[in-house]
């Protein structure tokens, strides 16, 4: 690499954005093919390519940031702004689902029976599994904060314990959500209620899986001594994302499960 007289990271050409984009195309088209033709081939190909891209792209970033020292303070500042803007874009993404839900529920049409929930829909009890899920996610928010403070204080073992606990709580939430879907008395095809419920809670569930993956990578990196008390932005970004997922769930719980039922 040529000598440079500034602190910014001039990245090398990388194939991973292209392979990531192809994986996204395969995943979206594969989901449509799965829904309509019951074939999992395209979806499986998309998942494999996405996993390969994630592994190799994150490997390269760890090499550049942790071992080559390219993540200087100005670069980290840029990464912080990038993560903040990414989470902001996610807020607007979920805003669309809440808009759809409130648009349909605040002025239900005659086709829905003029009431909400629509006539014939049996809703889920908000004080059973959804309330347990809320407690699980709030607890995971506490454990991820514990992990953050442990990293800043150089408490390696406590960080590993707290991160492990957070990931387990994330997987437990996903399991409970899956069981709730399996036992739900309505489907995604049951009119606007089914559509808004499953799309909003389903995308949130996907974000929980993504957040759990981020934290699992952070756990592996912590075990391999990648983080110091001063240099741990990878974990910080994952923690921000986890708190965002937490807050979105609270809005989902209050809006769709409690008020909407």
UniProtKB/Swiss-Prot annotation:
Residues passing through the membrane, by range: 16-34, 41-66, 73-105, 129-152, 156-183, 191-223, 233-256
Gene: mt-co3
Organism: Salmo salar (Atlantic salmon)
Protein name: Cytochrome c oxidase subunit 3
Top-level division of the source organism's lineage: Eukaryota
Entry annotated with the keyword Nucleotidyltransferase: no
GO BP annotations, alphabetical order: mitochondrial electron transport, cytochrome c to oxygen
Enzymatic reactions: 4 Fe(II)-[cytochrome c] + O2 + 8 H(+)(in) = 4 Fe(III)-[cytochrome c] + 2 H2O + 4 H(+)(out)
Main location (coarse class): mitochondrion
């Amino acid at each position: 690499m040529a000598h440079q007289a500034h602190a910014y990271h001039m990245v090398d050409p990388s194939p991973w954005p292209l392979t990531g984009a192809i994986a996204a195309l395969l995943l979206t088209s594969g989901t449509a093919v799965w829904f309509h033709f019951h074939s999992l081939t395209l979806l499986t190909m998309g998942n494999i390519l996405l996993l390969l891209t994630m592994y190799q792209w994150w490997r390269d970033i760890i090499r550049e940031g942790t071992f080559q020292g390219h993540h200087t303070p100005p670069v980290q500042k840029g990464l912080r702004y990038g993560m903040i803007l990414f989470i902001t874009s996610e807020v607007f993404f979920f805003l669309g689902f809440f808009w759809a839900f409130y648009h349909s529920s605040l002025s239900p049409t005659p086709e829905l029976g003029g009431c909400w929930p629509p006539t014939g829909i049996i809703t889920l009890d908000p004080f059973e599994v959804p309330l347990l899920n809320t407690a699980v996610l709030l607890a995971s928010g506490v454990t991820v904060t514990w992990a953050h403070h442990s990293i800043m204080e150089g408490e390696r073992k406590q960080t590993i314990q707290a991160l492990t606990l957070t990931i387990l709580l994330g997987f437990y939430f996903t399991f409970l959500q899956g069981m709730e879907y399996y036992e739900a008395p309505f489907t995604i095809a049951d009119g606007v209620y089914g559509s808004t419920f499953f799309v909003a809670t389903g995308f949130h569930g996907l974000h929980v899986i993504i957040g759990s993956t981020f934290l699992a990578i952070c756990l592996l990196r912590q075990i391999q001594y990648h983080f110091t008390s001063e240099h741990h932005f990878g974990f910080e970004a994952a923690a921000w994302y986890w708190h965002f997922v937490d807050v979105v769930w609270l809005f989902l719980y209050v809006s769709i499960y409690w008020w909407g039922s």
